[in-house]
Amino acid sequence: MGGAEPKVLAAGGLLWRRDTGGGVEVLVVHRPRYDDWSFPKGKCDPGESFEQTARREVLEETGYAVAFGAELSEVRYHDHKDRPKLVRYWAMTVTDGSFTANDEVDDARWLPLAQARSLVTYAHDRDLLDGLLAAI
């Protein structure tokens, strides 16, 4: 980002669980507005902490209440309007809820890490999967 101060602040989570064989599955979401596969996240509301944003956005986009695990690496990039953006992510586990398709996310899939890596649209999301695996 060339040191530009982020104009857009956002937060989200990588929701994960163990499958029946002890492997790791992660939730990947499809956003029809961008036609991409990524992880649930969204912009911070005024006065909201990154953690509050992550919890709210994950619930709004997926229907899942979560418990926070380790903070993962932050991601910096330019958004679709070419504004510098900073997104902070956490490893998360589901405590309650169920997915219902909505305007922001029309599909959500629990996938093994290798399949998630193949499906996500952005390289920085593949890097986040590496961070998740190291953190859990």
Predicted regions and their residues:
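Unchanged
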Residues: 42-131
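Short, well-ordered strand-loop elements centered on a beta-strand within folded domains, enriched
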Residues: 22-28, 98-101
